[in-house]
């Protein structure tokens, strides 16, 4: 990790120092994904089976996972694992149930009633990556709010063979259908539908560059599907003062660095002593990690920033807008009102990022790569949509008519004006 003194940098250097590592996109990925999507749209299930065998080197017996296979997953898991998953489920459900929106009903003037109502998105698709380690936590983070929101159909795609933990949590969440499909072909199948895979209205979940590009492409097609949010590499920023525990900070930085070589970790502190202690602790703890080589690559593009004060550290954090923000200071809650841009915030020594990643109850699907300035952490609202309602009485329309007519005339929209005056004339005739 590189250490820099913030005040010694010019404004241009400060901007440059906080730039994220570039995301490798490339025309080859764009073209390859477009080909996969086109193949799935034209060949349907046959394309899914062919691409699964090609990319995953597996030939599933069926695209949809049978119920008996999902039920059998429970028998192969330890009691300890099931208890952990159920505890996480309980906490995540509690927090997301509390997010249920309340209807709004306001009489803006006599006889003019305005309302806001919320309805669930009818059909949603969840993408769960494969790889060397299963991600049942992501199933929880997507499946729990989808069901609480009331989505009528919730389906899940994951590359085969699907881990027992994922199948168990899918059943725990009440997910309707699980498919043995991964990669960009899974995104295409959910966006456009095949004989076996249900078409959905919105797709959620992380993935590699091909999955991310597939989500982008289908979301740009009105016949495709909406997506949750733009994706980018994982990141964490820690604000720490002289009271912070350097071993805790190092552990938090490394827990993010081990996600991938493109992850970025940043420490901002006014204490050079803490900075040095954290540097030593990172090197010491790194040796014990099974993914040390991955974490080491991430650390190469990571930073320790020496700020003038905690106030300046907050400003740096707000400018950077991290996915995860950890505050290890004497009075961390006092800083909360000053923090504007972050996906999820972890206050105090006893709030490691890992808690939020798995089981505290908050959602771990978060905006990254600076999108925290405009995007929120995933929640119940992402699985719903709002509608407004207005109901005017005869008296209400008469009272509002002069305002609407004047504005319609100013905009040159005669039919808008007439839709009001024709009603007012009718009311006048009926008196």
From Swiss-Prot:
<dbReference type="InterPro" id="IPR001692">
    <property type="entry name" value="Histidinol_DH_CS"/>
</dbReference>
<feature type="binding site">
    <location>
        <position position="259"/>
    </location>
    <ligand>
        <name>substrate</name>
    </ligand>
</feature>
<keyword id="KW-0862">Zinc</keyword>
<feature type="binding site">
    <location>
        <position position="259"/>
    </location>
    <ligand>
        <name>Zn(2+)</name>
    </ligand>
</feature>
<feature type="active site" description="Proton acceptor">
    <location>
        <position position="324"/>
    </location>
</feature>
<feature type="binding site">
    <location>
        <position position="208"/>
    </location>
    <ligand>
        <name>NAD(+)</name>
    </ligand>
</feature>
<feature type="binding site">
    <location>
        <position position="416"/>
    </location>
    <ligand>
        <name>substrate</name>
    </ligand>
</feature>
<feature type="binding site">
    <location>
        <position position="416"/>
    </location>
    <ligand>
        <name>Zn(2+)</name>
    </ligand>
</feature>
<protein>
    <recommendedName>
        <fullName>Histidinol dehydrogenase</fullName>
        <ecNumber>1.1.1.23</ecNumber>
    </recommendedName>
</protein>
<dbReference type="GO" id="GO:0004399">
    <property type="term" value="F:histidinol dehydrogenase activity"/>
</dbReference>
<keyword id="KW-0560">Oxidoreductase</keyword>
<dbReference type="InterPro" id="IPR016161">
    <property type="entry name" value="Ald_DH/histidinol_DH"/>
</dbReference>
<comment type="pathway">
    <text>Amino-acid biosynthesis; L-histidine biosynthesis; L-histidine from 5-phospho-alpha-D-ribose 1-diphosphate: step 9/9.</text>
</comment>
<dbReference type="InterPro" id="IPR012131">
    <property type="entry name" value="Hstdl_DH"/>
</dbReference>
<feature type="active site" description="Proton acceptor">
    <location>
        <position position="323"/>
    </location>
</feature>
<dbReference type="GO" id="GO:0000105">
    <property type="term" value="P:L-histidine biosynthetic process"/>
</dbReference>
<feature type="binding site">
    <location>
        <position position="185"/>
    </location>
    <ligand>
        <name>NAD(+)</name>
    </ligand>
</feature>
<comment type="function">
    <text>Catalyzes the sequential NAD-dependent oxidations of L-histidinol to L-histidinaldehyde and then to L-histidine.</text>
</comment>
<feature type="binding site">
    <location>
        <position position="256"/>
    </location>
    <ligand>
        <name>Zn(2+)</name>
    </ligand>
</feature>
<comment type="similarity">
    <text>Belongs to the histidinol dehydrogenase family.</text>
</comment>
<keyword id="KW-0520">NAD</keyword>
<feature type="binding site">
    <location>
        <position position="256"/>
    </location>
    <ligand>
        <name>substrate</name>
    </ligand>
</feature>
<feature type="binding site">
    <location>
        <position position="324"/>
    </location>
    <ligand>
        <name>substrate</name>
    </ligand>
</feature>
<keyword id="KW-0479">Metal-binding</keyword>
<keyword id="KW-0368">Histidine biosynthesis</keyword>
<dbReference type="GO" id="GO:0008270">
    <property type="term" value="F:zinc ion binding"/>
</dbReference>
<keyword id="KW-0028">Amino-acid biosynthesis</keyword>
<feature type="binding site">
    <location>
        <position position="234"/>
    </location>
    <ligand>
        <name>substrate</name>
    </ligand>
</feature>
<dbReference type="GO" id="GO:0005829">
    <property type="term" value="C:cytosol"/>
</dbReference>
<feature type="binding site">
    <location>
        <position position="411"/>
    </location>
    <ligand>
        <name>substrate</name>
    </ligand>
</feature>
<feature type="binding site">
    <location>
        <position position="357"/>
    </location>
    <ligand>
        <name>substrate</name>
    </ligand>
</feature>
<feature type="binding site">
    <location>
        <position position="127"/>
    </location>
    <ligand>
        <name>NAD(+)</name>
    </ligand>
</feature>
<dbReference type="Pfam" id="PF00815">
    <property type="entry name" value="Histidinol_dh"/>
</dbReference>
<dbReference type="InterPro" id="IPR022695">
    <property type="entry name" value="Histidinol_DH_monofunct"/>
</dbReference>
<dbReference type="GO" id="GO:0051287">
    <property type="term" value="F:NAD binding"/>
</dbReference>
<feature type="binding site">
    <location>
        <position position="357"/>
    </location>
    <ligand>
        <name>Zn(2+)</name>
    </ligand>
</feature>
């Amino acid at each position: 990790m590189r250490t820099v003194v913030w005040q010694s940098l010019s404004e241009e250097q400060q901007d440059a120092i906080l730039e994220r590592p570039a995301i490798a996109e490339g025309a080859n990925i764009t073209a390859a994904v477009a080909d996969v999507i086109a193949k799935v749209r034209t060949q349907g299930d046959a394309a899914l089976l062919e691409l699964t065998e090609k990319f995953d080197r597996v030939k599933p017996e069926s695209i949809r996972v049978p119920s008996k296979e999902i039920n059998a997953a429970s028998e192969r898991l330890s009691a300890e694992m099931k208890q952990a998953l159920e505890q996480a489920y309980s906490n995540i459900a509690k927090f997301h149930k509390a997010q249920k929106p309340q209807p709004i009903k306001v009489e803006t003037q006599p006889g003019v009633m305005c309302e806001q109502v919320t309805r669930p998105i009818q059909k949603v698709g969840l993408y769960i990556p494969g790889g060397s380690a299963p991600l049942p936590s992501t199933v929880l983070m997507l499946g729990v709010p989808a069901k609480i929101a009331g989505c009528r159909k919730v389906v899940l795609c994951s590359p085969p063979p699907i881990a027992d933990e994922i199948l168990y949590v899918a059943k725990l969440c009440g997910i309707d259908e699980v498919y043995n499909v991964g990669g960009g072909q899974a995104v295409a199948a959910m966006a456009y539908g095949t004989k076996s895979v249900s078409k959905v209205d919105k797709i959620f979940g992380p993935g590699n560059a091909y999955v991310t590009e597939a989500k982008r492409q289908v979301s740009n097609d009105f016949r495709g599907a909406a997506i949750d949010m733009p994706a980018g590499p994982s990141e964490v920023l820690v604000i720490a003062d002289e009271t912070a525990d350097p071993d805790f900070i190092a552990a938090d930085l490394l827990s993010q660095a081990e996600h991938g070589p493109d992850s970025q970790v940043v420490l901002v502190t006014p204490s050079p002593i803490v900075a040095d202690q954290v540097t030593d602790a990172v090197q010491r703890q790194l040796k014990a990690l099974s993914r040390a080589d991955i974490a080491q690559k991430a650390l190469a593009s990571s930073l320790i920033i020496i700020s003038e004060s905690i106030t300046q550290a907050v400003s740096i954090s707000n400018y950077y807008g991290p996915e995860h923000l950890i505050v290890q200071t004497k009075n961390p809650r006092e800083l909360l009102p000053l923090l504007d841009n972050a996906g999820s915030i972890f206050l105090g020594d006893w709030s490691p990022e890992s808690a939020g990643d798995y089981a505290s109850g908050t959602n771990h699907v978060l905006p990254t790569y600076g999108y925290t300035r405009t995007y929120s952490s995933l929640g119940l609202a992402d699985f719903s949509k709002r509608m407004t309602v207005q109901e005017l009485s005869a008296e209400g329309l008469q009272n509002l008519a002069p305002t609407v007519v004047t504005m319609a005339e100013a905009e040159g929209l005669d039919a808008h004006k007439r839709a009001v005056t024709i009603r007012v004339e009718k009311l006048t005739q009926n008196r």
